Protein backbone atom coordinates (compact mmCIF):
# COMPACT_ATOMS: atom_id res chain seq x y z
CA UNK A 1 0.00 0.00 0.00
CA UNK A 2 1.17 3.53 -0.66
CA UNK A 3 1.68 6.12 2.07
CA UNK A 4 -1.18 8.22 0.69
CA UNK A 5 -3.53 5.26 1.03
CA UNK A 6 -2.29 4.56 4.59
CA UNK A 7 -2.87 8.16 5.70
CA UNK A 8 -6.44 8.15 4.39
CA UNK A 9 -7.48 4.98 6.26
CA UNK A 10 -8.52 6.90 9.36
CA UNK A 11 -10.59 9.30 7.23
CA UNK A 12 -12.60 6.52 5.57
CA UNK A 13 -14.67 5.57 8.63
CA UNK A 14 -16.67 8.45 10.12
CA UNK A 15 -18.64 6.84 12.96
CA UNK A 16 -20.52 3.68 13.90
CA UNK A 17 -24.25 3.58 13.21
CA UNK A 18 -26.21 2.82 16.39
CA UNK A 19 -29.76 1.86 15.47
CA UNK A 20 -31.98 -1.02 16.50
CA UNK A 21 -31.30 -2.85 13.24
CA UNK A 22 -27.54 -2.31 13.49
CA UNK A 23 -27.51 -3.43 17.14
CA UNK A 24 -29.37 -6.63 16.27
CA UNK A 25 -26.82 -7.32 13.52
CA UNK A 26 -24.05 -7.38 16.14
CA UNK A 27 -25.24 -10.89 17.08
CA UNK A 28 -24.37 -11.96 13.51
CA UNK A 29 -20.90 -10.38 13.85
CA UNK A 30 -21.86 -7.55 11.47
CA UNK A 31 -20.95 -3.94 12.27
CA UNK A 32 -22.45 -0.87 10.56
CA UNK A 33 -20.39 2.26 9.96
CA UNK A 34 -20.99 5.60 8.29
CA UNK A 35 -18.17 6.02 5.79
CA UNK A 36 -16.88 8.60 3.34
CA UNK A 37 -19.13 8.58 0.26
CA UNK A 38 -16.11 8.25 -2.06
CA UNK A 39 -14.74 5.15 -0.31
CA UNK A 40 -14.75 1.83 -2.16
CA UNK A 41 -15.21 -1.59 -0.57
CA UNK A 42 -11.48 -2.49 -0.58
CA UNK A 43 -10.67 0.81 1.16
CA UNK A 44 -13.35 0.21 3.80
CA UNK A 45 -12.07 -3.32 4.39
CA UNK A 46 -8.46 -2.12 4.74
CA UNK A 47 -9.48 0.69 7.09
CA UNK A 48 -11.45 -1.59 9.44
CA UNK A 49 -8.68 -4.20 9.48
CA UNK A 50 -6.01 -1.58 10.19
CA UNK A 51 -7.90 0.45 12.81
CA UNK A 52 -9.48 -2.39 14.80
CA UNK A 53 -7.00 -5.26 14.16
CA UNK A 54 -9.68 -7.70 12.98
CA UNK A 55 -10.20 -9.92 9.91
CA UNK A 56 -12.99 -8.72 7.59
CA UNK A 57 -14.91 -11.40 5.67
CA UNK A 58 -17.14 -9.11 3.58
CA UNK A 59 -18.33 -5.55 3.07
CA UNK A 60 -21.78 -4.47 1.89
CA UNK A 61 -22.42 -0.80 1.12
CA UNK A 62 -25.50 1.33 0.62
CA UNK A 63 -25.53 4.80 -0.85
CA UNK A 64 -29.02 6.29 -0.36
CA UNK A 65 -30.02 9.51 -2.13
CA UNK A 66 -29.51 12.84 -0.39
CA UNK A 67 -32.51 14.15 1.51
CA UNK A 68 -33.90 17.62 0.99
CA UNK A 69 -34.32 19.73 4.13
CA UNK A 70 -36.38 22.89 4.34
CA UNK A 71 -36.08 25.71 6.88
CA UNK A 72 -38.69 28.36 6.22
CA UNK A 73 -38.45 29.36 2.60
CA UNK A 74 -34.89 28.09 2.22
CA UNK A 75 -34.35 24.63 0.80
CA UNK A 76 -31.13 22.69 1.07
CA UNK A 77 -29.73 19.19 1.02
CA UNK A 78 -28.20 17.08 3.75
CA UNK A 79 -24.65 15.87 3.30
CA UNK A 80 -24.04 12.66 1.37
CA UNK A 81 -24.05 9.59 3.62
CA UNK A 82 -22.78 6.14 2.73
CA UNK A 83 -23.21 3.19 5.08
CA UNK A 84 -21.09 0.06 5.17
CA UNK A 85 -22.02 -3.22 6.84
CA UNK A 86 -18.82 -5.06 7.70
CA UNK A 87 -18.89 -8.79 8.49
CA UNK A 88 -16.03 -10.02 10.67
CA UNK A 89 -14.42 -13.44 10.95
CA UNK A 90 -15.57 -15.84 13.64
CA UNK A 91 -14.09 -14.87 17.01
CA UNK A 92 -13.20 -11.27 16.07
CA UNK A 93 -14.98 -8.44 17.85
CA UNK A 94 -15.01 -4.63 17.84
CA UNK A 95 -15.64 -2.86 21.15
CA UNK A 96 -18.26 -0.19 20.30
CA UNK A 97 -19.73 0.31 23.75
CA UNK A 98 -17.71 0.92 26.93
CA UNK A 99 -18.06 -1.86 29.47
CA UNK A 100 -19.59 -0.91 32.81
From Swiss-Prot:
SUPFAM superfamilies associated with the record: Ribosomal proteins S24e, L23 and L15e
PANTHER family for the chain: 60S RIBOSOMAL PROTEIN L23A
Gene3D superfamilies found in the cross-reference section: 3.30.70.330
Function: One of the early assembly proteins it binds 23S rRNA. One of the proteins that surrounds the polypeptide exit tunnel on the outside of the ribosome. Forms the main docking site for trigger factor binding to the ribosome.
Assembly and interaction partners: Part of the 50S ribosomal subunit. Contacts protein L29, and trigger factor when it is bound to the ribosome.
GO molecular function, one term: structural constituent of ribosome
Keywords carried by this UniProt record: Ribonucleoprotein, Ribosomal protein, RNA-binding, rRNA-binding
Record protein name field: Large ribosomal subunit protein uL23
A GO CC term assigned to this protein in UniProt: ribonucleoprotein complex
Superkingdom of the source species: Bacteria
GO BP: translation
Classification via InterPro entries: Nucleotide-bd_a/b_plait_sf, Ribosomal_uL23-like, Ribosomal_uL23/eL15/eS24_sf, Ribosomal_uL23_CS
Any Pfam family: Ribosomal_L23
Protein family according to the UniProt entry: Belongs to the universal ribosomal protein uL23 family.
Gene: rplW
Amino acid sequence: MSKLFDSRLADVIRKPVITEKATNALDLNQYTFEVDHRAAKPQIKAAVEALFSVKVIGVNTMNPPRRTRRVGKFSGKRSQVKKAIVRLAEGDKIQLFPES
